[in-house]
């Protein structure tokens, strides 16, 4: 069936629908950064530092001080898709900076599964790294500063699909053999 079989308004709607669908199909979606990517493609610490990461959701935090109150200067807002770069790499964690010269924020794997993502984390009193979403009181410790999370304790890292694709393409690929014709 061709477009000529449709009346003019329906023909225009069909063409617009086709154009919209084709436009949607070309947009790259930046995926969560899964453990499987790092493991399966043997992504090195140096390569991790070249990837563009983003935060998956909005974060709202208040700096905690002895006064107990919150001033506007103590409110920290990090918007969804704020870009960041890896500064340090551990076996199951990454430290990602979202500001120039910033010390970075910890993200730790949620589990040992291949589908685990790197979620917001913090150092605990005993020096271990805990997921902020697992804490009874969601407080993020950054050096000497402490921040109570009002929103976003469950955020995780997403990665630029384009950058990740470049790393994957840099791996050896088998070209295959063709028979003589």
Give the predicted meaning of each segment:
Residues 2-13:
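Bacterial N-terminal signal peptides that target proteins for export
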Residues 20-23:
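C-terminal motif of bacterial Sec signal peptides marking the signal peptidase cleavage site
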Residues 30-54:
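Post-signal peptide N-terminal segment of mature Sec-exported envelope proteins
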Residues 39, 64-82:
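N-terminal post-signal-peptidase region of extra-cytosolic proteins
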Residues 54-67:
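Generic short beta-strand segments
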Residues 124-181:
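C-terminal partner/receptor-binding element of secreted or periplasmic proteins
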């Amino acid at each position: 069936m061709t477009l000529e079989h449709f009346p003019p308004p329906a023909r225009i709607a069909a063409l617009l629908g086709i154009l919209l669908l084709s436009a949607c199909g070309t947009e790259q979606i930046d995926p969560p950064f899964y453990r499987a990517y790092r493991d399966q493609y043997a992504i090195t610490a140096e390569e991790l530092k070249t990837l563009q990461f983003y935060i998956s959701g909005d974060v709202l935090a208040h700096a905690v001080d002895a006064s107990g109150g919150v001033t506007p200067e103590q409110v920290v807002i990090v918007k969804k898709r704020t870009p960041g770069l890896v500064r340090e790499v551990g076996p199951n964690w990454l430290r990602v900076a979202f500001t120039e010269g910033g010390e970075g924020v910890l993200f730790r794997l949620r589990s040992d599964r291949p589908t685990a993502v790197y979620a917001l984390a913090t150092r605990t009193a005993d020096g271990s790294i805990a997921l902020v979403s697992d804490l009874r009181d969601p407080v993020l410790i950054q050096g000497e500063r402490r921040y109570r999370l009002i929103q976003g304790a469950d955020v995780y890292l997403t990665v630029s699909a384009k950058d990740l694709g470049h790393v994957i393409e840099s791996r050896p690929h088998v070209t295959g053999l063709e028979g003589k014709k």
